[in-house]
């Protein structure tokens, strides 16, 4: 195994023309590592469309009287015209409908989370030990194929559909967690923010597209086609993934010598070798790791609240109909998709030009993202009379929140690249924990008092996010921790 000193020595032996070629790979987007970011962008896009498609399709899948009663309970002004369109569409498309109670619908929508909560840590460990190519690829393939079979499973019975969704949740975690083991091998430190944010922006784009097109697909083609279309897109992504993606640049058959050398030399100071053992005791005692964990939980509390209740807030408080609610709910994700990439580019620019240190960049982007996004949400209850002002605040909150993806949310790769897959799995558990608790608490507040409930929801989410920020600012670091380095042995 090559050490950092060996790699430095080899770098010194590189001829000047090769060094010039190597320098050229520091600029531009025509490289295999950026190609990997684009493919992962498509993978994340596919996974998030598959996560959200049932939320839209279930309105058309259930008996219209059940759907109508749910709609009347969740909005102040039921959009009767939109409901008539749904009824006409169901009759014309002849898609099957089911007499699922609200309780069964809730279990179906939650079943994906059951699998997602179980799988992250073992998935991250397996990806870190055996490599991420087949972990991510198989996860995407399984999730996509199961998406295609959802209409058949629904016909077979609700129990089979629940089991299918649990397995699908586990498969999706394989993609969302395992990909970070790839970045530990492929992302030079000075490009880490932009590469990861390009890939992560696929989740925003997927959410945006489902919010925009999900209802239209169900209306025009029938609800089964929302599963056929997005499941088919996922299968198509697998055709790109397996032949083009490799676990590391050393084994990639199509990479140029210059790019391989640039990535290898850039990562020479970091120990990215795969390891079987986990320094659990050292991890538990590591305050920089706890800073990331706490920040993850608190930031996802705010994010989960916004994602879960933005459509409800727009429909009930702003009294938008179904069509307008979908379009307006998609706007924050559209702008967030763009700004998450711009934030990554800005972070890497500040680092490559040595304007700021890496730890300063991580703390600065996290602080701006948390303070601005949470602060903008606080006045929402007082501007509810203006739809344009409310939407402007929601969009701005999403824009600033995207900066955290270049801050605390990728900081674990800085402190322990060797255990990137395992740590991402651990952090996913805390994010799912926040995602399970936050909407429940928000629902309790809103049910108690519709006017002051929203105010309490936003204040609580902002307060939790700021507390997490303070903990992160105090204890976070950006250098590789001692427990994340490969042990060295002295031979006498």
From Swiss-Prot:
GO terms for molecular function: symporter activity; thyroid hormone transmembrane transporter activity; urate transmembrane transporter activity. It is a multi-pass membrane protein. It comes from the Eukaryota. It is found in: Apical cell membrane. It catalyses: 3 Na(+)(out) + phosphate(out) = 3 Na(+)(in) + phosphate(in); urate(out) + n chloride(in) = urate(in) + n chloride(out); L-thyroxine(out) = L-thyroxine(in); 3,3',5-triiodo-L-thyronine(out) = 3,3',5-triiodo-L-thyronine(in). The keyword Transport applies. Its main location: membrane. InterPro entries: MFS, MFS_dom, MFS_Na/Anion_cotransporter, MFS_trans_sf. Residues 1-20 are annotated as: Disordered. Expressed in the small intestine (at protein level). Keywords: Cell membrane, Glycoprotein, Ion transport, Membrane, Sodium, Sodium transport, Symport, Transmembrane, Transmembrane helix, Transport. It holds the Pfam family MFS_1. One of its GO terms (biological process) is sodium ion transport. The chain crosses the membrane at residues 112-132, 134-154, 156-176, 198-218, 225-245, 287-307, 327-347, 363-383, 393-413, 426-446, 456-476. One of its GO terms (cellular component) is brush border membrane. Glycans are attached at residues 18, 44, 53, 63, 72, 87. The keyword Magnesium does not apply. Acts as a membrane potential-dependent organic anion transporter, the transport requires a low concentration of chloride ions. Mediates chloride-dependent transport of urate. Mediates sodium-independent high affinity transport of thyroid hormones including L-thyroxine (T4) and 3,3',5-triiodo-L-thyronine (T3). Can actively transport inorganic phosphate into cells via Na(+) cotransport. Belongs to the major facilitator superfamily. Sodium/anion cotransporter family. PANTHER family: SMALL INTESTINE URATE EXPORTER-RELATED (PTHR11662:SF284), SOLUTE CARRIER FAMILY 17 (PTHR11662). This is Probable small intestine urate exporter. It comes from Mus musculus (Mouse). The lineage of its organism: Eukaryota, Metazoa, Chordata, Craniata, Vertebrata. The gene is Slc17a4.
